[in-house]
């Protein structure tokens, strides 16, 4: 053999199994292993010859022991042959576990390691060789599993009991096993179990799939099926891995067919009755829409994304916010590429229809969508902002082009206009805006948007709910209906004679006009929005601290004990005043009972909002007033309990 030419040596070795007697196998194997150690170029024919010889268990173990160390240093062209040989010759005993572990330790991400940047042609050739080697390694896994059923059982057991983080090779094995008949349920169970343990992670999935496009193209449907199974799991950790599968498949496989399949899988999840599935699918789409160039890729399949809207009626509020954030991101992506705002796109048309719909459900969806899009558009630093505009702005301000600002203002006006005469919807719109501005991603909203909303909220609040007090904080009489016998009184006046405003509660609650009575529905929501915008524009709520100590325009509690209670300062005064209020309330006619209950309910919610708005302030004066408001809240809740107790009796008796 040493005297023969290399090509002749390969041909002779390949012919060994045809003319060697079984009794000579030991000597032949020893010779072949020596040839393999002496000349790595002979490794392929040696492996081919060894796989066609009849070897006993001891001799086979010797061969495997010699071959396994060559896995880590094998050339790209030889590696698939080594993998296939080891899998086909592995049994079901302990040696098969060693064989499997040596294969699992392969760093599949290193198959495409190129040369230095200076040798570009060689690097591209190396990358092509790596891609081909990846495909051949996966083919060798499939061939080994199909030819040796015993090893598949060992593989499944080893993967299931793994306690450390899985490798990309493990993911390849799972995908190959998933493609073989009869193994799908077991592979699904292993993936869910290992994901729950935290050893099958999103990072492993990304490493296994992202760098192996050509190799895994045949197994795209297997990866998609695994993604769906993991996303449907009730545990958040498998869902996280399922999301990584979907995200990586969309980014890695650039063909339209593959991306449409990924989107169709996500759409299927959004139509599920499981809120967890919907959240997971929407979050994947949101992440893709928030990143370039993935947002541009997603826009090319916008029709598929819009199919999610078919399930919107079943979505929770947060899911609707996420959905419209996706569309807002895609609109911004289109604006960056075209330079203009799509004013008549389908999403804008849908929002107009929802906001104009008489059904509160659709109007609510429109408010959620419009608010999500406003905050998304307003929080983005757009490259179209001019240098001059940027120079005039504060460093922390987020500047957006005039066209986009006009679009946002128009959408806000559309929201407020659609809520005219519908206080419940208007209160919800205020709450949505306040919630959006309190979130961390809105700290860079264009200050012009915040200022416009603050000015509108401030004007509506002052004009709708505050009255001026006379000299020495005297309460001016307000018009009351004829049926009302209650006298008016200022409650909870912390500013005493310095008070200049009072919160108008009783006159609004007792008004003969339904529009004025319904104004109280939006009181707390509007104040919450006012606090949010004030804090973002000024850094604190000192500009509106006058409302913290101002009194409430309420009814006088006219009993013999009420005056004594109001004069006391000990903790017993609350109990005495509760007794006085109970006596006062019990003697009222039903209509006045309902009115007083409404006033106390409004006062309770108002005090709670004051605490929410001012509890973080550092000023000593405001902290003292806040503590007093906390005491007031306790007293109001006791009064509200008394009111509800009596009203419940009336409802039962009637």
Predicted regions and their residues:
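Long internal repeat-built scaffold domains in very large eukaryotic proteins
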Residues: 1-9, 14, 20-26, 30-34, ...
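Alpha-solenoid HEAT/ARM repeat scaffold
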Residues: 10, 44, 80, 240-243, ...
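Short, hydrophobic/aromatic alpha-helical segments in well-folded domains
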Residues: 15, 31, 226, 245, ...
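Helix-turn-helix repeat elements of alpha-solenoid scaffolds
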Residues: 23, 148, 216-221, 256-259, ...
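Eukaryotic, compositionally biased intrinsically disordered regions
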Residues: 25, 229, 294-297
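Extended, well-ordered protein cores
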Residues: 191, 204-205, 226-238, 242-251, ...
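Eukaryotic tandem repeat interaction scaffolds
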Residues: 305-320, 328
């Amino acid at each position: 053999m040493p005297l023969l030419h290399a090509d002749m040596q390969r041909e002779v070795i390949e012919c060994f199994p045809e003319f060697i007697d079984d009794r000579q196998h030991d000597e032949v194997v020893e010779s072949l292993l020596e040839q393999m150690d002496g000349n790595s170029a002979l490794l392929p024919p040696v492996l081919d010859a060894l796989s066609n010889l009849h070897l006993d268990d001891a001799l086979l173990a010797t061969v495997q022991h010699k071959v396994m160390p060559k896995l880590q240093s094998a050339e790209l062209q030889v590696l698939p042959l080594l993998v296939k040989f080891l899998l086909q010759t592995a049994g079901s005993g302990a040696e098969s576990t060693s064989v499997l572990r040596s294969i699992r330790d392969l760093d599949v991400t290193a198959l495409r390691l190129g040369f230095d940047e200076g040798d570009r042609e060689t690097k591209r050739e190396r990358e092509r060789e790596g891609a081909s080697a990846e495909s051949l390694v996966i083919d060798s896994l499939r061939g080994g599993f199909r030819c040796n059923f015993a090893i598949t059982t060992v593989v499944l057991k080893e993967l299931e009991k793994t306690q450390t983080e899985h490798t990309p090779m493990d993911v390849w094995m799972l995908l190959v096993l998933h493609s073989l008949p009869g193994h799908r349920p077991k592979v699904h169970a292993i993936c869910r179990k290992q994901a729950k343990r935290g050893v099958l992670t999103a990072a492993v999935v990304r490493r296994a799939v992202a760098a192996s496009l050509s190799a895994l193209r045949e197994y795209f449907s297997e990866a998609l099926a695994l993604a769906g199974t993991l996303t449907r799991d009730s545990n958040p950790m498998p869902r996280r891995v399922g999301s990584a599968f979907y995200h990586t498949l969309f980014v890695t496989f650039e063909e339209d067919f593959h991306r449409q399949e990924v989107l169709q899988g996500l759409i299927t999840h959004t139509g599920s009755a499981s809120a967890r599935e919907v959240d997971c699918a929407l979050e994947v789409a949101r992440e893709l829409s928030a990143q370039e160039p993935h947002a541009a890729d997603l826009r090319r399949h916008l029709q598929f994304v819009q199919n999610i809207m078919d399930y919107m009626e079943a979505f929770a509020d947060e899911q609707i916010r996420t959905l419209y954030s996706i569309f807002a991101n895609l609109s911004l992506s289109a604006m960056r590429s075209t330079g203009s705002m799509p004013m008549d796109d389908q999403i804008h048309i849908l929002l107009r229809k929802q906001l104009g719909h008489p059904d509160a459900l659709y109007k609510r969806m429109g408010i959620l969508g419009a608010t999500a899009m406003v905050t998304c558009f307003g929080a983005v630093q757009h490259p179209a902002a001019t240098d001059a505009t940027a120079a005039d702005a504060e460093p922390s301000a987020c500047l957006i082009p005039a066209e986009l600002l006009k679009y946002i203002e128009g959408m806000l006006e559309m929201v407020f206009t659609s809520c005219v005469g519908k206080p419940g919807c208007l209160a919800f719109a205020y709450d949505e805006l306040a919630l959006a501005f309190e979130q961390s991603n809105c700290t860079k909203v264009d200050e012009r948007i915040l200022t416009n909303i603050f000015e509108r909220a401030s004007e509506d609040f002052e004009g709708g709910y505050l009255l001026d007090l006379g000299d020495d904080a005297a309460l001016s009489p307000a018009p009351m209906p004829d049926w009302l016998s209650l006298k008016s009184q200022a409650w909870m006046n912390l500013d005493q004679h310095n008070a200049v405003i009072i919160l108008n509660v009783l006159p609004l609650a007792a008004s003969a006009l339904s529009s004025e009575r319904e104004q109280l529905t939006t009181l707390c929501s509007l104040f919450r929005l006012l606090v949010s915008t004030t804090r973002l524009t000024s850094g604190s709520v000192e500009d509106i601290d006058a409302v913290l100590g101002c009194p409430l325009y309420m009814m006088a509690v006219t009993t013999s004990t009420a005056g004594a209670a109001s004069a006391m300062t000990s903790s017993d005064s609350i109990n005495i005043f509760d007794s006085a209020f109970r006596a006062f309330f019990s003697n009222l006619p039903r209509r006045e009972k309902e009115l007083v209950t409404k006033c106390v309910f409004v006062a309770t919610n108002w005090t709670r909002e004051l605490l929410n708005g001012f509890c973080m302030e550092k000023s000593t004066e405001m902290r003292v007033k806040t503590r007093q408001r906390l005491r007031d809240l306790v007293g109001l809740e006791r009064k509200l309990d008394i009111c509800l107790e009596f009203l419940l009796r009336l409802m039962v008796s009637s």
